[in-house]
Amino acid sequence: MTEKHLLKDMTWVEFRERLAENPVILLPFGSQEEQGPMAPMGDWMLTEAIADRIAREAGAIAAPTMPFGYADYFRPIPGGIAFRPDTFRRVLEDICENFLNHGLDHLVVFNGHSGNFPLVDQTIRKIKEERGVLIPCLNVWRLMTAKEWEAFHPQGMKAFGHGGDPLTSVYLHLFPELMRMDLAEPSPEPGTLLDLPTAGLNAVKFQGVDINLAVDVTDRAANGVAGGDPTQSAAEIGEKMTNFIVEFTVDFIRHFKTVETRTHKK
């Protein structure tokens, strides 16, 4: 029988049998948030699908995907579900503790929502201090460098942005039946706050310098497309991006299996 690689599919006896090998446990996190007018709000589905493939190819075990994250700047648009910062930190810590308490110390956070990362960083630092275990975090959509963007997308890094790529192209590759490309439209000119143009979702520009500010997505773009141009997205681009993310993460997991993660024991 083929070895199972998804924790949700395993019996507890099957999982217990894997404990001796101290497998790498992939912890996928995503978000329930708007992704422009043409894409489903459940972007955690992308993280889940990619994590499934990675775990299968790397001999790892993928935990169930956490579909909610920290996404305060998307609250003005209905349909999103976001944790408070403290809730997110507690959820991640509790998930990690459940594995650490059984001696599993090769955990990898597979983060499919960039807004989660500051809270992930705070939590894995706390675990390092209190449990003496190093837990890496791979930010899914930041794994591609400018080199990959130039190779995969005719617009290069200019295509990157919330509501643009990589998510739109990856959606077209993995879930084309859910897409409404008839509603796709480019990112509009940045909105303004304090009579200054918004720059992303956490700043405005003043004399070419980013000034941090509490920017909501609707301050930046009424249509929810805060960067890039989803009309230029394509399933073929998404396939290349997905393959790269899988191959990179599988390579990392194979390395991670071979190293010690404990800095001390408490």
Positions of the model-derived regions?
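Extended, histidine- and acidic-residue-enriched regions that form the cofactor-binding/catalytic faces
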Residues: 1-106, 114-266
